């Protein structure tokens, strides 16, 4: 079986081990590796997003030098999705090295960070990429090629609207955004990232996972006690297998044959 190389980029202030469920799966639900996907994780760093993108580009070059099979698949979770799309933005000539780009729960045009500084200070997280996620940050304007503004709607609330048509990705790039939608938030966000932000205002092809447990953490099977307590998320294993299935279908991956041995009596 041909082995596909996938590089996985973790989210904000998160270790790569948070991908373990998607990678390895469980005895009941085999993970990505059972589909012949060689999963390599990018490390946890505390630099800015711009610096991290350059570091990521060097990482990809090292994989090529080591003889890994190319083109490769990029998968980024949350802030990690900004890194993989940022790589395509900064290094367009290298787009041919990437077969598929997958972003999970990624705020492609940013998030509102007015409450996050207090959480950031309380947790004392060292990640310098915090400010880059803001809707109005210079990084977001660079990534999308445009900024945005708030517009009051007839529905009685404000919508974030881009000032002009954004940069989406390299021509012909195979991209997919996977996002959760929970009923307690009106089925339009995962508790942290809005559907419009995850899809760049419906411009990036998307797959939505909807349900009471399809929150920002469960979508990759990562359970953070603090986030669970502060956001009221419920934790279980119902959602990440749906994410796994979405990824493998997008890649056209087939599971390897499983050999089950007859138990000894």
Model-based region annotation:
Residues 18-20, 86, 113-115:
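Short, solvent-exposed loop/turn and secondary-structure capping segments
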Residues 7, 38, 73, 100-102, ...:
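A structural signal for isolated positions on well-ordered beta-strands in alpha/beta enzyme cores
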Residues 89-265:
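Helical cap/lid subdomain of alpha/beta-hydrolase-fold lipid enzymes
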Residues 76-80, 84:
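Gly/Ala-rich beta-loop-alpha elbow adjacent to hydrolase catalytic centers
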